[in-house]
Design a protein with these regions (language model features):
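Residue-level detector of functionally pivotal "anchor" positions at catalytic/ligand-binding pockets or at interdomain
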Residues: 179-201
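N-terminal beta1-alpha1-beta2 submodule of the flavodoxin-like/Rossmannoid cofactor-binding fold
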Residues: 6-94, 103, 170, 174
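Short, conserved loop/helix-junction motifs that constitute active-site signature segments
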Residues: 33, 86-87, 112-120, 132, ...
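C-terminal tail/sorting-segment detector
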Residues: 213-223
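A glycine-anchored, Pro-Gly-centered beta-turn/N-cap motif
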Residues: 121, 210-213
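Solvent-exposed loop/turn segments at secondary-structure junctions
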Residues: 20-23, 44-48, 98-102, 129-133, ...
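Short, glycine-/small-residue-rich phosphate/pyrophosphate-handling segment
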Residues: 124-157
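Glycine-rich phosphate/pyrophosphate-binding loop and the adjoining helix
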Residues: 150-181
């Protein structure tokens, strides 16, 4: 017996990330090996900056400017223009470094500019840090994306467990019930070949699988 479920391919996931040291980029690579998603990398407009130089002087300066006037667009560092429309996505996963107990300034810029467009969307947060806890980053995210539908748990990956990120990500996706929240769930049929494909509304879509996301024998299949 075949078990198939067809979902609306427009209900997609976007992973938005900023990476300074490369750790968040590695996290995103691992994450997207376990799920289907588009990826958007946030880049600072001014290249080659050393945020950690002179005892983290520049990074601290950027964060202090945001803290002083968090509602002023001029407080946030410039980032490269972003062409990706959030209208195409139902789920946004934010992957960001922690800077001095707060969200990295460049990611704060992106969320200041686009966080209001995430209202009503599923929002997940993955934070990379050396060792510090992530409560300040969570607070920044909820300030900048106040109307997001946050998953039940955030994921913290630090220096000591970064090498184990594949397992941590897999456990997190299970804990937040990602497949169910995003419309991927199992359904069974006793129908014989040819296999009929139905959408979530019960409408017949095709006699054979076409492009989309399916569940085959309890496993997600991308065609």
């Amino acid at each position: 017996m075949l078990t198939w479920l067809h979902t609306d391919v427009t209900a997609k996931t976007l992973v938005v990330y900023y990476s300074y040291t490369g750790n968040c980029r590695e996290i995103v690579t691992t994450l997207t090996s376990q799920m289907e998603a588009d990826v958007l990398e946030i880049q600072p407009a001014e290249k080659g900056l050393k945020y950690e130089a002179n005892n983290y002087a520049l990074g601290t300066q950027l964060l202090n400017a945001i803290k002083a006037n968090p509602n002023d667009a001029g407080s946030y560092p410039a980032i490269d223009p972003v062409a990706t429309s959030l209208n195409d996505y139902e789920t946004i996963i934010i992957v960001t470094p922690l800077w001095w107990s707060l969200m990295a300034a460049n990611m704060q810029t992106y969320l200041f500019n686009y966080g209001s467009q995430m209202a009503g969307k599923n929002v997940g947060l993955i934070v990379s840090s050396a060792s510090s806890g992530i409560s300040g980053v969570v607070d920044d995210c909820k300030r900048l994306v106040p109307e997001g539908k946050y998953f039940s748990e955030n994921l913290w990956i630090n220096h000591s467990n970064h090498s184990n990120r594949a397992t941590l990500i897999q456990e997190w996706l299970t804990a937040i019930d990602y497949n169910t929240v995003t419309g991927i769930s199992e359904t069974k049929t006793t129908a014989t070949a040819p296999t009929r494909i139905y959408d979530l509304g019960g409408r017949l879509m095709a006699e054979e699988p076409s492009k989309g996301i399916y569940i085959k024998n309890g496993k997600k299949v991308i065609r």
